[in-house]
Regions:
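Short acidic/polar active-site loop segments enriched in Thr and Asp
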Residues: 44-45, 100, 132
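Catalytic-site signature of metal-activated, phosphate-bearing donor transferases
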Residues: 84-89, 113-279
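Active-site-proximal specificity loops/subdomain of glycosyltransferases
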Residues: 58-101
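Short beta-strand-to-loop acidic/aromatic patch adjacent to the donor-nucleotide binding site
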Residues: 99-112
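N-proximal low-complexity "stem/linker" segments adjacent to membrane-targeting elements
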Residues: 1-32
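Short, acidic, metal-binding catalytic loop of nucleotide-sugar glycosyltransferases
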Residues: 36-45
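Short beta-strand/loop segment that forms part of the nucleotide-sugar
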Residues: 44-53, 75-78
Length: 279
């Protein structure tokens, strides 16, 4: 007989409000999946900071129904260079009195909670009473050796091959006075952090119960679109692009087809990688 032991969960009594702040650029293919994922688990509001180029994609039409229902608010950050930290501070400063918790995940980061189907129940546990923010480790979903985009859900396309990493993303408590956020991972050294089990000094990395599925790469085509557009933190130099490409092949299978595709789309010579394949 199989014995299943569920964790003992002690909840606070009060109702809480949860929002999500995210910087988004060239995410029209995936943004609905992202919104529906967090809506399904009980998030009250999503603040989407539109960081597309001035003449680039636009969220207003594709998100019109969510905007009408006031579930989504789009904030104009179009054309801004490396504005991630500025976005986090702006979102928190304007809204910290209205929400108990702020999810500060990227647009390709999907939280997984094994024992909860509602994030409010998870966050309302007494184990988090003394935590200023809760950190979740990320597990990269590999490219599944897919070169091109497919019009399917991310979970269908990249359902296996999880690569765990040591970096994490936070869910931050609201109503912290005069808070200045300095980083996207460790927000502020003065804040008390806890892991997803409420422990402040436990460095155990969990990738099975409470963690983030990080669809950072997707297919080779989509990864290179990400590389070419840049991110919200670093300047998009050739050196930065090359660092990301090396990281891509550290985690995903290196093939000549992928290398040739990346060279063609970035204009960066990857001869040193081709030599590794021939060895």
């Amino acid at each position: 007989m199989l014995l299943i032991i569920f964790p003992k969960i002690i909840l606070n009594s009060k109702d809480i409000r949860v929002c999500l702040c995210v910087l988004a650029k060239l995410e029209n293919k995936y943004i609905i999946q992202y919104i529906e994922h967090y809506k399904k688990i009980g998030v009250d509001k999503m603040f989407i900071y539109d960081n597309n180029d001035l003449n680039g994609e636009n969220f207003d039409f594709i998100l019109l129904e969510y905007i009408k229902k006031k579930f989504v608010e789009v904030i104009n950050f179009r054309g801004k260079i490396s504005p991630q930290i500025k976005m986090l501070n702006d979102c928190y400063k304007k809204n910290n009195k209205n929400y108990d918790w702020f999810i500060l995940f990227d647009a390709d980061e999907f939280i997984e909670l094994k024992y909860f189907n509602n994030i409010k129940l998870f966050l309302n546990q007494k184990i988090f009473n003394k935590c200023d923010y809760i950190y979740f480790y990320r597990a990269y979903q590999t490219d599944a050796n897919k070169i091109k985009f497919e019009n399917k859900s991310l979970s269908e396309r990249f359902s296996t091959s999880v690569y765990p990493v040591h970096t994490y993303k936070p869910i931050l408590r609201g109503n912290i006075s005069n808070l200045k956020i300095h980083g996207v991972h460790k927000l502020n050294f003065k804040l008390k952090s806890c892991n997803s089990f409420g422990k402040s000094k436990d460095k155990t990395r969990d990738f099975k119960i409470n963690f983030i599925k990080h669809y950072y790469f997707k297919s080779t085509e989509e990864f290179i679109e990400k590389v070419n557009r840049g991110d919200g933190v670093f300047n998009n130099t050739e050196g930065t692009k090359l660092t990301k490409i090396k990281f891509y092949f550290k985690i995903n299978k290196m093939t000549l087809e992928k290398i040739n595709y990346i060279e063609n789309k970035t204009g960066i010579s990857l001869l040193f990688l081709k030599k590794k394949i021939k060895k």
